[in-house]
């Protein structure tokens, strides 16, 4: 009797489609968090795309402009800083909130969301909403840093009233640093004109704009100063802690999780 021939077939498993949509994709901590999350999910078998109105995110992960985003009933939607029309129907809708007062959830109809993700306990307590929610910290980049010992300090983040950039400059110069590099975009021109421009004009501060390469940015400074009025997580502090960079500012005391831990928290939420 001839042996019976059997053929094994592998049935491909369709990847779950995740679409991250934000109304802000200029440089910043929130945009970096979304880029890192997109790459993390794609590395672990999801089909994830990050959509937004600006161009900065487009070459850093699987991404597209927001007008290319088509949502359907099989999609998992993660939305940030944007109100999605109620008539949009998806498999699951998660609100990813990085903000406090600029996006107060008590003023938003939260019934359309299946869950809400905060980045820290203090932020969740500030928002104080009675809805299903999780706390998932963002990925913190691990940066190699060598102290240039150059008497130059850095201030990282947008230049605006909330960041209190002028106080960071004043503290750094008062501590003996010769110059302060400002890595960030001017988001508040009146604030800049009234409080920061004088430091730039005197040569004590230099507008260094946003730097895409974190190792190049941190490698130019001997310390980092931070004076923000409100932080939900504190990504700059966390990056400095992991790299051993002197950080001068109020601590958020935030947990820093490994990528695998962060992925597992999202995996539990998406399924």
Q: Where are the language model's segments positioned?
A:
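N-terminal pre-catalytic "stem/leader" segment of glycosyltransferase-like enzymes
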Residues: 1-73
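Donor nucleotide-sugar binding/catalytic pocket of nucleotide-sugar-dependent glycosyltransferases
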Residues: 112-144
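Nucleotide-activated donor-binding/catalytic signature segment of Leloir-type glycosyltransferases, i.e.
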Residues: 193-211
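Short alpha-helical donor nucleotide-sugar binding micro-motif in glycosyltransferases
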Residues: 210-211, 216-221
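Conserved donor-binding/catalytic core segment of Leloir-type glycosyltransferases
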Residues: 19, 140-163, 169-175, 180-181
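Extended catalytic core of nucleotide-activated donor transferases of GT-like folds
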Residues: 4-6, 57-114, 118
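Aromatic "clamp/platform" in nucleotide-sugar-dependent glycosyltransferases that forms part
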Residues: 229
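Glycosyltransferase donor-sugar binding loop
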Residues: 52-56, 179-193
